[in-house]
Amino acid sequence: MRYPFLRLAVFLAACIAPVWWLYQAWIFALGPDPGKVLVENFGVATLVMLLITLSMTPLQRLTGWSGWIVVRRQLGLWCFAYALLHLSMYALFILGLDWGQLGVELVKRPYIIVGALALLGLLALAVTSNRYSQRRLGARWKKLHRIIYVILGLGLLHMFWIVRADLKEWALYAGIGAFLLLLRIPVFARRIPRLGGAAKARSVKVQNNG
C-alpha cells in the first residue's frame, strides 16, 4: 500500500468532525434543536468533502506529487459516508423515521429530490470505485465518474434552495466549485504550472550559469 501514513491521516481527519458533532449532540451542546444542526452540519460537510476530492487532481498537476491522487478515492468514499450520515440524521430527526411523511416532505421541500439525486450519483461512484469495476467497465468507467461534476451542481443547488436567504457561505462553495471545474477544461488545465518542474528548471538554469 502506497502512502500508508497519509491514508491513516486522512482517515483520522475525516473522523474528527462526525465524532465531535455526535459527541456535542450527546452532551446537549448543539442548542435547542440538535437534530437540525446535525442534518445541516453533515450536509455542508458532504459538499466540502466533495470539493476537497475534486481538488486532488489540480493539486497533483500543480505539485507533481502522486499522494494527492492516492487519497482521492478515499476522500470520495468519505464524501459518500458523510452524505449517508446527512440522510440518516434527516430520517431520524426530521422525519422521525415516519416514512409516511416523506411524500409530504417531497412536495413541501422539493430540494430533497435534488439531494436524493446527488446521493444516488455518489452511490454509483462509491460502488464502482474499485479496480474490478475499472477493469469491467473499461473506458466507460471514466465517463461514469464524470458525473461527479453533475453531483457537484446538484449539491450546490440543494444547498442554494435551503439557504437562499443568506448566500454568503453558499457563494464561497460555489466559487470554489466553479474554479475547480474551470481547471478541468483542457485549455486551462494545460496552464497549471508545475511547482516541482519550475524548481527543477531554476536548478538547471543555476547549474548552467555556474
UniProtKB/Swiss-Prot annotation:
It is found in: Cell inner membrane. Its cofactor is FMN; heme b. One of its GO terms (cellular component) is plasma membrane. Its main location: membrane. Binds 1 FMN per subunit. Binds 1 heme b (iron(II)-protoporphyrin IX) group per subunit. The chain crosses the membrane at residues 8-28, 37-57, 75-95, 110-130, 147-167, 169-189. The keyword Methyltransferase does not apply. Belongs to the MsrQ family. GO terms for biological process: protein repair. Heterodimer of a catalytic subunit (MsrP) and a heme-binding subunit (MsrQ). GO terms for molecular function: electron transfer activity; FMN binding; heme binding; metal ion binding; oxidoreductase activity, acting on diphenols and related substances as donors. Part of the MsrPQ system that repairs oxidized periplasmic proteins containing methionine sulfoxide residues (Met-O), using respiratory chain electrons. Thus protects these proteins from oxidative-stress damage caused by reactive species of oxygen and chlorine generated by the host defense mechanisms. MsrPQ is essential for the maintenance of envelope integrity under bleach stress, rescuing a wide series of structurally unrelated periplasmic proteins from methionine oxidation. The keyword Phosphoprotein does not apply. Keywords: Cell inner membrane, Cell membrane, Electron transport, Flavoprotein, FMN, Heme, Iron, Membrane, Metal-binding, Transmembrane, Transmembrane helix, Transport. This is Protein-methionine-sulfoxide reductase heme-binding subunit MsrQ. It is a multi-pass membrane protein.
